[in-house]
Design a protein with these regions (language model features):
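Acidic, proline/glycine-rich low-complexity IDRs
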Residues: 122-154
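Cysteine-rich micro-motifs
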Residues: 43, 51-67, 135-145
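A short, highly charged nucleic-acid-interacting micro-segment common to nuclease
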Residues: 12
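Short recognition patches in nucleic-acid-associated and regulatory proteins
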Residues: 1-6, 17-52, 67-87, 93-130
């Protein structure tokens, strides 16, 4: 099943089809994670909470004591960037994701990716990196507020 190379080592509960794949993110078997962002979490009306980009940039990374592990960076991930064979950009400042509802810093993260047809994707050196859409869901482990963002990557 297709998954981006950066996500593959942390993917759990993988499910999907040739064109759409969903996975939870786990670190050492744990799904309660500290997340670093270039972006923001916004509370919305009627539970429509959002994960928003900071300008044109959204970066999501796992926080670890020995360094953050990028899961998604809108500047270099996805179909258009794989097509252009873009190199990783300079590091960007990240900040801890904090739930705006309860101020908790632990989240469960689910990612979904949409891919073009198999024939088109097979032309890439790393087909899993050639996704056209990503859906990110971050659920606070304390108050269970869910923050969602979807981004085009083509």
């Amino acid at each position: 099943m297709l998954l981006p190379a950066a996500v593959r080592p942390y993917a759990a509960d993988v499910d999907g089809t040739d064109s759409r794949v969903r996975c939870a993110i786990a670190l050492n078997g744990l799904k309660d994670l500290r997340i670093q962002l270039c972006g923001r979490l916004k509370r919305g009306l009627f539970g429509r909470n959002q994960l928003l980009a900071d300008g044109d940039v959204l970066c999501v990374a796992l926080h670890q004591p020995d360094g953050d592990v990028p899961l998604f960076d809108s500047r270099c991930d996805g179909y258009a960037n794989a097509l252009d064979d873009r190199q990783p950009p300079a590091p960007i400042p990240l900040h801890p994701a904090i739930c705006p509802k309860c101020r908790n810093a632990a989240f469960q993260v689910d990612l979904s990716f949409e891919y073009p047809d198999a024939e088109e994707v097979s032309a890439f050196a790393n087909p899993g990196d050639a996704f056209t859409w990503i859906w990110i869901s971050m659920r606070c482990t304390r108050c269970h507020a869910v923050f969602r963002g979807d981004f085009t990557a083509d």
